[in-house]
Amino acid sequence: MKKDYYEILGLSKGASKDEIKKAYRKIAIKYHPDRNQGNEEAASIFKEATQAYEILIDDNKKAKYDRFGHSAFEGGGFEGFSGGFSGFSDIFEDFGDIFDSFFTGNKGQERNRKHAKGEDLGYNIEISLENAYFGYKNNINITRQMLCDSCLGKKSEKGTSPSICNMCNGSGRVVQGGGFFRVTTTCSKCYGEGKIISNPCKSCKGKGSLTKQETIQLNIPPGIDNNQQIKMKGKGNVNPDNQEYGDLYVKILIRSHKVFKRNGKDLYAMLPISFTQAALGKEVKIKTIASKEIKIHIPKGINNEEQILIKNAGMPILQTEKFGNLILITKIKTPKNLNSNAIKLFENLGKELKDGDEIDLLKA
């Protein structure tokens, strides 16, 4: 016994056209064969819903169905279509957004897959701040899909050729359904290829590519920053269909440095100084990230956590000949373990500076 068309769409008798369209749309999206390839139950549900929609969306056929049920269309097929394909047209006009994606989208995906380059790959490498300053060359080992040496991506044994798929006649697409409603789907036999590999290559088992390890020289330019990527063209996986390789993206991870902290092109470092150096000022020598010894001037009367700017002693600016700055942050060291002479000196200094017993917090 055939199912009631209203029941198939989850509707009650007397449903409006809008309700019929909404109900069918919901089922079509969920059970369309291209979204459920190989699922016979989904294909059956989709077919039933489509038949129900064809009848209920057409006023004449709906009236006949409401009066006579399924018997109205037995024997003579879908009579009533002779007056025009209004119900059928409605399907494509009202649900063009669904069916366009099924009918043309998959074709486009197959076409794009055959013409697209291979898959891109990612690789992370950790380097020191010094490596980032000077630049760095290193060999890295990657695993990727490369063109099969035996079949050169053709997927068949040497001396043999693929045969045309007899299910889709080489188109990669098959038409399902009958009557006035047909659905085009990816061929389940050749999976959209349009051909069958009768004698697959023994080396790659018909894939057209092999997994291989390769050693690649990586050149990291001076000034590279943390989390930046280097693109290595053609060092990704191969697409055997067109023999084009994807790219390799190497992500740079820079280790923390025990002295220097980086902020873009600039470097920051703490500068430990004594009370006397802070009070009187002094010229001192320091070493930069480049291990270069330079003289800097500590101005007299400098306070704790004040900054001293050293121009062009920061990081190289990528792909230029310019440099960032080095910013030194003073850290005045409090002397400990004083001997008797040092204690007397500080006591006398305190008297000279009139250090009192009271401190005004408002002057802090």
Curated annotation (Swiss-Prot):
Superkingdom of this protein's organism: Bacteria
Subcellular location: Cytoplasm
This protein's UniProt keywords: Chaperone, Cytoplasm, DNA replication, Metal-binding, Repeat, Stress response, Zinc, Zinc-finger
Function statement: Participates actively in the response to hyperosmotic and heat shock by preventing the aggregation of stress-denatured proteins and by disaggregating proteins, also in an autonomous, DnaK-independent fashion. Unfolded proteins bind initially to DnaJ; upon interaction with the DnaJ-bound protein, DnaK hydrolyzes its bound ATP, resulting in the formation of a stable complex. GrpE releases ADP from DnaK; ATP binding to DnaK triggers the release of the substrate protein, thus completing the reaction cycle.
Quaternary structure note: Homodimer.
One GO MF term attached to the UniProt entry: unfolded protein binding
ZnF start-end (CR-type): 135-213
Cofactor mode of binding and number, as noted: Binds 2 Zn(2+) ions per monomer.
Primary subcellular site in the record, as a coarse category: cytoplasm
PANTHER family: CHAPERONE PROTEIN DNAJ, DNAJ HOMOLOG 1, MITOCHONDRIAL-RELATED
UniProt source species: Borreliella burgdorferi (strain ATCC 35210 / DSM 4680 / CIP 102532 / B31) (Borrelia burgdorferi)
Taxonomic placement: Bacteria, Pseudomonadati, Spirochaetota, Spirochaetia, Spirochaetales
Cited Pfam families: DnaJ (PF00226), DnaJ_C (PF01556), DnaJ_CXXCXGXG (PF00684)
Sequence positions that bind Zn(2+) 2: C165, C168, C187, C190
UniProt cross-references to NCBIfam families, sorted A to Z: DnaJ_bact, PRK10767.1, PRK14285.1
GO cellular component, one term: cytoplasm
Residue intervals of the J domain: 4-69
Entries under Gene3D superfamilies matching the protein: DnaJ domain (1.10.287.110), Heat shock protein DnaJ, cysteine-rich domain (2.10.230.10), Urease metallochaperone UreE, N-terminal domain (2.60.260.20)
Entry's family note: Belongs to the DnaJ family.
SMART domains: DnaJ
One biological process term in Gene Ontology: chaperone cofactor-dependent protein refolding
Protein known as: Chaperone protein DnaJ
Binding, Zn(2+) 1: C148, C151, C201, C204
Keyword rRNA-binding set for record: no
Known cofactor(s): Zn(2+)
Ranges occupied by CXXCXGXG motif repeats: 148-155, 165-172, 187-194, 201-208
Domain notes: The J domain is necessary and sufficient to stimulate DnaK ATPase activity. Zinc center 1 plays an important role in the autonomous, DnaK-independent chaperone activity of DnaJ. Zinc center 2 is essential for interaction with DnaK and for DnaJ activity.
